[in-house]
């Protein structure tokens, strides 16, 4: 029957099997012996059939395997049925063993009670064997009232005889009589197998009840949700989960039985209805599990969300918060007018490239490991490689020397005039060879001259510097002579001659450069204005000497006046040279002899005082010239007439000597002041 009704509520397990069977026996004993009315379950009926057979064989003893079956089979079959007899014996032995195991747990009292109802059980067995397809209506009503598990057992018992009828039968007519015995044996075997399955099911239930209960939270939640709306029954403890555990055990047993029914593969409508009922139960269970999973997932998600709210912000949240703060700060600064200072990026200074000094000399052994740069041409690249000339250079392009030897002349060809290598020589033979006479001597002379030049070069430089200094002396002398010309213009030519003679003595081998004649300044230079007095007096003396011949008296008077004027000292120091004390020095010179001035002793003869020495020599020559002139005048008769002229000349010479001594004293003091 197909069940369109909701699944049955879970119920508790039956009472122990022994009490249940005893109640059924007492209940069945009250009915008549009509075979059509029976209220016993199919499993109980099968057990009763087995017990009646055992009670008939040995009512007061334990169950023993029946031996009459094997004996009757041997009598019927005879010699030709030995093989089938052996099969029947084995089947009967197995049956006796199984029945013995079952009968061990049955009381003798139950067996005696069963013996009273032998007729009832016989009629029931005939009903099963004769009408396998048809079942009485009373039994059908009873099956519907019973549990589903017992109904399944009955269906299995009804179907298995069909399998048992497929026993192979020999076509021999002698074996037809023996077919009835195996059928009866097989029917008994089917009944015993059904009983065994029922007993095994009960044992499994009892063992599952004894197992520890899994206190998983999901199971408790699911049971509590299914039975959550019900109130607590009387006598039931709140929170007692034993009933729920029993319900779960029943569900496992039902699923196991459904699996067995699916393996049988029968097409009965009752089985299909049972399968649909089991599928609905499974669907309900699956829905309950899904609901439990959703509730558990929600329970798991709820604490997680609360933890996230309470926990610290993540890195992304912190980054977003910082970005918002920066944007807000930038807007505030823009509103206030604050601008960021923009600085030009400073370019890094380029590193100076340091070349390897060993590589420049062509002898770096570090190679690629060298810390300094090799990106340059070594200095040895301008010299030929001697190893390449002999074709033994192993460096190739990395050689620091030049391998293009055609740029360099061949030494053998230039010096000797020939090369023993001939055309195989890598050097150039384009140069003209030297003569044999020139080559050895010329090389020696050239080398000797180079050595001497190198050795005497410092001496030459010193001599050259001295010569240059001497060449500059005439210019200095010309300046001094020009200054002296202001003092003594009459003896200008004599002084020039004397200076030329002295310079010729000093520079005997040196030809002085030609100095252009210096013009006389119209105005005395600054600082030398005191010489203007002497100049005017000297000019007057020159005029007087020119006009002395016609007017001797006037000339004498003029010369005396000039000498007196020249002997007088200036009242004050000249303008511009007030730092010199001429008065004390001039008084000393007047007290001394004019022939031997004291300043001449202090003059130095070193090369630095060439000017002073030249002036001294010029003065000496002038004095000698004047003395010689006087002597000539004394010896000459023409000049002896005019004695007055002689006296005047002597006075003039004396005055000139005094003037020269004064000039020397002035120049010496001036030179000492500079030093």
Swiss-Prot record:
Region feature (Disordered): 294-320, 487-572, 586-612
Compositional bias (Low complexity): 490-504
Amino acid composition bias (Polar residues), ranges on this chain: 543-567, 597-612
Zinc fingers classed as C3H1-type: ranges: 350-377, 384-406, 409-432
InterPro entries, sorted: Su(sable)-like (IPR045124), Znf_CCCH (IPR000571), Znf_CCCH_sf (IPR036855)
Domain of life: Eukaryota
PROSITE patterns: ZF_C3H1
GO terms, biological process: negative regulation of DNA-templated transcription
Coiled-coil parts of chain: 314-342
Gene3D superfamilies referenced in this protein's UniProt entry, alphabetically: 2.30.30.1190, Zinc finger, CCCH-type
Protein EC: 3.1.-.-
GO molecular function per UniProt: DNA binding; nuclease activity; RNA binding; zinc ion binding
Ranges annotated as biased composition (Basic residues): 307-320
UniProt feature, compositional bias: Basic and acidic residues: 586-595
DNA-binding among keywords: yes
Keywords: Coiled coil, DNA-binding, Hydrolase, Metal-binding, Nuclease, Repeat, RNA-binding, Zinc, Zinc-finger
Function (record text): Possesses RNA-binding and ribonuclease activities in vitro.
The protein, known as: Zinc finger CCCH domain-containing protein 65
Native species: Arabidopsis thaliana (Mouse-ear cress)
